[in-house]
Amino acid sequence: MSVACVLKRKAVLWQDSFSPHLKHHPQEPANPNMPVVLTSGTGSQAQPQPAANQALAAGTHSSPVPGSIGVAGRSQDDAMVDYFFQRQHGEQLGGGGSGGGGYNTSKHRWPTGDNIHAEHQVRSMDELNHDFQALALEGRAMGEQLLPGKKFWETDESSKDGPKGIFLGDQWRDSAWGTSDHSVSQPIMVQRRPGQSFHVNSEVNSVLSPRSESGGLGVSMVEYVLSSSPGDSCLRKGGFGPRDADSDENDKGEKKNKGTFDGDKLGDLKEEGDVMDKTNGLPVQNGIDADVKDFSRTPGNCQNSANEVDLLGPNQNGSEGLAQLTSTNGAKPVEDFSNMESQSVPLDPMEHVGMEPLQFDYSGTQVPVDSAAATVGLFDYNSQQQLFQRPNALAVQQLTAAQQQQYALAAAHQPHIAGLAPAAFVPNPYIISAAPPGTDPYTAGLAAAATLGPAVVPHQYYGVTPWGVYPASLFQQQAAAAAAATNSATQQSAPQAQQGQQQVLRGGASQRPLTPNQNQQGQQTDPLVAAAAVNSALAFGQGLAAGMPGYPVLAPAAYYDQTGALVVNAGARNGLGAPVRLVAPAPVIISSSAAQAAVAAAAASANGAAGGLAGTTNGPFRPLGTQQPQPQPQQQPSNNLASSSFYGNNSLSSNSQSSSLFSQGSAQPANTSLGFGSSSSLGATLGSALGGFGTAVANSNTGSGSRRDSLTGSSDLYKRTSSSLAPIGHSFYSSLSYSSSPGPVGMPLPSQGPGHSQTPPPSLSSHGSSSSLNLGGLTNGSGRYISAAPGAEAKYRSASSASSLFSPSSTLFSSSRLRYGMSDVMPSGRSRLLEDFRNNRYPNLQLREIAGHIMEFSQDQHGSRFIQLKLERATAAERQLVFNEILQAAYQLMVDVFGNYVIQKFFEFGSHEQKLALAERIRGHVLSLALQMYGCRVIQKALEFIPSDQQVINEMVRELDGHVLKCVKDQNGNHVVQKCIECVQPQSLQFIIDAFKGQVFALSTHPYGCRVIQRILEHCLPDQTLPILEELHQHTEQLVQDQYGNYVIQHVLEHGRPEDKSKIVAEIRGNVLVLSQHKFASNVVEKCVTHASRTERAVLIDEVCTMNDGPHSALYTMMKDQYANYVVQKMIDVAEPGQRKIVMHKIRPHIATLRKYTYGKHILAKLEKYYMKNGVDLGPICGPPNGII
C-alpha cells in the first residue's frame, strides 16, 4: 500500500510492506525515480477493500520484492494519523497499483504503519530529494542543538526484523527528547509505548510527529534518504555486487536479539560467515552484531552503558577473538567490485563521521598493489604482510573498498575525467608539494597539483582538529623521491615472509596520506607524476642546502561536495583552489644529503633482513620490531644543520641529525628514515596507514627529561631500554596538569616550554577497526568517538575499552604495574607511582608499597589522606616504616598544607618514642611554627597528646617567653597559647601571666586576646587570675559595651567567683534600662539576671518595673526595643513567682500597643506560653476577632 503524505509540508510516498492484507506482485517493473519509504508498524486490522492486487502477505518475515502493492484498508483511527500525515485527497495515484508499488530498488527502505488508501499522486525523486535535503538540514541543526549525549545506535530486544525507517516506534534506547524535558512536544492524543521497538510489534499509535520525543527525525532522513549508501542489507554479502532479493528473507530468519552479546552468539557468528548484520541500518564489521551505541552527536559527550559488555567474552583474549571473527570471511574476488554505479558512501557534510563499516579478508587472492596490472587496493593484503603481526595471529585489516567506490562514482558521473576507473586510480588522496625555496608558499605547488592529476581530498580535512592534517615536514622528502627512482619490481622481488614473521609497514603508494612524493612507488608507469614529484623534492632539498627553506603545501585536486559526491576538479571549489600551507617553514627538516643515503637504502632493500622489503631502517620501507644499528655515512655537525625532528630539541649532541618524528636530538648516529626514531618500531607510516596523525613511537633510546613517549608498553613490538625516558603510563593524557592540546598541528603554545607534552593524540583509528575514510575525529579503538576538544578526554582517561589502544586490557600495549622505575618524575613534578595512584590505578595500595615515596605522598592531597587513613589501623612496623622516612624532613611536613596532617596522626597514633622524637624536631622552631598556619596545628597536637610532665613540653612552652603578646594577637599563635594554657601545668605558665600585666583591658578588647583571657580565667591558679580580674573590674563599664570585652565579662559572670559576680552586678545596677538597649551590653544584663543571686536579681527586676522612661515605664520601653525585649523575657523566665506576677500586671495594660511592634510580639508570645502552661485565663491577651495583631 502506498500513499503520498505530507510531513512538515514535505511530500513523500509511504509504502507499507508489512501489512497482513497485502502481497507483492513482482510483475511490475521497478521505477528508480521514486524512493520507497517503509514503516515498521504492524498493519491494523482494517477491512480489506477490493483491489486487483490485494492479497495476504507471506508473513512477518517476508522481505519486500520488486512489484506493486495494492490498496489496503484504512487504519483504525483516522484522526490520530491525519494529525501527522495529512492526505491530499484531490490527487490521484497514476497507474493504479503499478504507480503505487513499483518503486522497488534492490531493497525497500521505509514503510509506514498506517494502511492509507493508495489514491494520491507520487512525486519524482528529484523533488523528494530537494525537499528532504531541506528537511535534513533543518533536522540536523535541531539534532545538534537538542540531542544530549545518549547512546543512540542501539536497538532493543524486541527488534526482530524489518527495515529501519525514519519514523520509528522506539528508535533510541534512551529517548533523547524525553517527555520530562519536552512534554509539550508529545503528540496530542497519541500514545507512545516506550517498550515497543520499531518493527512489526508497533501499532498505529506509535507513529511519531516531527516534534515527538524520538529525536533524530531529521537525522534519520539524512542518513536514509539523501545517502544512497550501501549501508543496507545489500552489504551483508560483503561484496559490492547487486544483492539477491531472496537473501534478505534468509537474513531475517537469522536475526538475533541486539541488546547484549552473549557467548552462544559468537558461535552463530562463525556459522554465518561473511553475512553482515546491521544495527539501525549501519553495517557491522565481519558479522559482529556489535552495539555501536557509543556514537554521540554531541562531541565528547560519550557515555558508557551499564550493560555494555565485551563482545569477545570476559575470559577471551581480545585479539584472539578478533582473529577468529576475521578468519571467517573468505577472500572476495575482484569481480565483486565491478557493479558500483548505484552505490555510494557520501560523507555527511555537517558531522565528522568516521566510516568503518567494511572489513574484508584479502588472504592471498588480492592482486598485489605494486604489480604492473590494475591496482585494486590501497594496501597490500597478502596474508604474510599484515599491518600488525601478533603471536596470536590477530590480523588487523585495512579495507579500501570505500575509496574504490568513490573513484568509481566519480568516474561514472564525470566521464570526462581520464585515468579514473573502478580498478585503477590514483592512490594518494592528496598531494603535498614542497614549494621551491624563496617562492610564494601559497602559489607554489599548483603545477604539481595539475601534473599529478586528480586525487581525493575529503572536505572534512578542513573541519577536523589539527591532528587530522599531515605536515609534510614530518617526513624526509628526498628519501621518498629517491625511493621513487627504484623499480617497484625490486620491492616485490624478495621472498614472502612466513606467517609468524614481523611484517612490513609500507611507506609507498598503498598509504592514504603520506609524504609528498611517495605516490611514485606504485605508479612507475606515469612519467609525469614521477617527474613532478622528483623535481619538487629536489628543489626542496637544494633550497635547504642553500639555507632557504621551502614551504610544504597541500595542493588539493579533488574533494567531496556537501552531498558527499566526489568531484574531481582541481580548484573548482572556493577555498580549495590554492595550495594550503600546512606547517611553517622549518630549516631543520631534511639534510641535503638525505637523497643519496635513501638511494643506497632503497637499492639494498632487495636483500634486506626482513622479508626483503626493508634492508636498513633508512629506506622507505620499514620492518616492524627490528631494531638495527644504523651506520650513517652522511653525518653532519649540528652547527651546519640542526636536528630535524619535528618535535624536539638538539641539546644533547653536536653531531645529532635525528629525523625521528617525536624526539629530541640524540647522541647516537643520525638516521634518515621516514619519520622514525633511531630504534623505534612504529612510526609515521603506521600513523598514516591508520588514518591518524601520530601513533608513532619516538626515539626511545636517548634519555632526556623534556620529552615523553607517546606509546609505551611491554609488548614485544615496543621494547624499551633501561635508560629510556619517562613514559606516560596507560593513557595518553595521564595527568591533570597536562595541557590537553599542545596547539595547532602540534606546535607548542606560548605558555608551554620545551618540557611540555608535545606528542599528538593517538591515531584517529587504533588497531582493529580502521578504515581509510575515518575522517571524523578521535576514536579509542572500540568505535567510540571522542572529542578532540581540550578537556574532553577526561571522561575517557580511566575508561577501559576492549580494544582501546591504551587500555589496560589491550593486548597491543599490555599494562604492567611495575614496568617503570618508581623514581620516574612526571612533568607535573610527581613520581609515576603517585601519578598512577592519583588516577585510581592502584585501588588497593598498601603503605609498604609506597616505601620511598612517603614524603611525596604526604605532601599530596590524595596521598596524605591515604597515609592518614592507613596510619590509624597500621601495624607498628608499618608506622615505623613511615616514620623513618618523614623524621628527617619533619619540619618540612609540619608547615605543608597536607603534610602537617601526617605529623598530627603520629602525635595521635604513634608510639611514645615517636611522639618525643617529633617533639624534638619542633624544639627550636616553636615560635615560627606557632605563627604558621599549618605548623600551629602540629604544636597544638603535640601539646595535647604528649604528657605535660615531659621535659620537652616545658622546653617547647618556654620558647614562647618574650613573644607571648605577639602570639596572642596572631591569628595562628593565639591558638598555641590557648592550648598551652589548657594542657600545660599552670606553674609553667607564669611567664604568660606576667606578660599580661597592664595589658588585660587591651587584650580583652582584642578579637584573639579575649579568648586567651577566658582560658586564663578557666585554667590558671587563683593567685594567677587575681591580677587579671582586678584589671577587669577597673574597666567593667567599658568592657560591658565592647564587642569583644563583653565576652570576658560574661565569662566571669558564668564561671567567676561570687564576689566577682557581685562586683559586676553592682556596676550594672542603675543602668539596666540603658545597657539593656545596647547591642553588646544587653547580653551582659541577661547574664546578670541569670547568674546573680536571688537578692540581686530581685533588685534588677524591681528597677525595671518601677523606673519611668518619660511618660511610660521603663518596662514598656524595653518591651519595644530590639535588644531589651530579650532582657524582659529573661526576667519573666527567672523571676520568682510573686515578682513574675508583678511583672505581668505591669505588662497587661500595654498588650494592645505591643501588638503593633515586632519585638513586642515576643513578649506577648512569652505571656501566652506562661498562661497556657499554668492554666491561667488569658483574658484580653487573646487576639482580636479580626486576627490583626
From Swiss-Prot:
The modification Omega-N-methylarginine is found at residue 797. Residues 864-868, 936-940, 1010-1014 are annotated as: Adenine-nucleotide binding in RNA target. GO terms for cellular component: axon; cytoplasm; cytoplasmic stress granule; cytosol; nucleoplasm; P-body. One of its GO terms (molecular function) is miRNA binding. Residues 22-73, 233-272, 491-525, 614-647, 743-773 are annotated as: Disordered. SMART domains: Pumilio (SM00025). It is found in: Cytoplasm; Cytoplasm, P-body; Cytoplasmic granule. Disruption phenotype: Mice are viable and grow to adulthood without apparent defects except that they are smaller than wild-type mice at 8 weeks of age. Males mice however show significantly reduced sperm counts and fertility: testicular hypoplasia is observed. Heterozygous knockout mice manifest neurological dysfunction, hyperactivity, and progressive cerebellar signs including gross and fine motor incoordination. They show spontaneous seizures, abnormal EEG activity with generalized epileptiform spikes by the age of 16 weeks, and have smaller than normal cerebella. Keywords: Acetylation, Cytoplasm, Differentiation, Methylation, Phosphoprotein, Repeat, RNA-binding, Spermatogenesis, Translation regulation. Pumilio repeats lie at residues 849-884, 885-920, 921-958, 959-994, 995-1030, 1031-1066, 1067-1102, 1106-1145. GO terms for biological process: adult locomotory behavior; miRNA processing; mRNA destabilization; positive regulation of miRNA-mediated gene silencing; positive regulation of RIG-I signaling pathway; post-transcriptional gene silencing; post-transcriptional regulation of gene expression; regulation of cell cycle. Residues 900-904, 1046-1050, 1125-1129 are annotated as: Uracil-nucleotide binding in RNA target. The modification Phosphothreonine is found at residues 112, 515. Phosphorylation at Ser-715 promotes RNA-binding activity. Following growth factor stimulation phosphorylated at Ser-715, promoting binding to the 3'-UTR of CDKN1B/p27 mRNA. Residues 974-978 are annotated as: Non-specific-nucleotide binding in RNA target. Residues 829-1171 form the PUM-HD domain. InterPro entries: ARM-like (IPR011989), ARM-type_fold (IPR016024), PUM-HD (IPR033133), Pumilio_RNA-bd (IPR033712), Pumilio_RNA-bd_rpt (IPR001313). Residues 512-525 have a biased composition (Polar residues). Residues 1082-1086, 1083-1086 are annotated as: Guanine-nucleotide binding in RNA target. Sequence-specific RNA-binding protein that acts as a post-transcriptional repressor by binding the 3'-UTR of mRNA targets. Binds to an RNA consensus sequence, the Pumilio Response Element (PRE), 5'-UGUANAUA-3', that is related to the Nanos Response Element (NRE). Mediates post-transcriptional repression of transcripts via different mechanisms: acts via direct recruitment of the CCR4-POP2-NOT deadenylase leading to translational inhibition and mRNA degradation. Also mediates deadenylation-independent repression by promoting accessibility of miRNAs. The pumilio repeats mediate the association with RNA by packing together to form a right-handed superhelix that approximates a half donut. RNA-binding occurs on the concave side of the surface. PUM1 is composed of 8 pumilio repeats of 36 residues; each repeat binds a single nucleotide in its RNA target. Residues at positions 12 and 16 of the pumilio repeat bind each RNA base via hydrogen bonding or van der Waals contacts with the Watson-Crick edge, while the amino acid at position 13 makes a stacking interaction. This is Pumilio homolog 1.
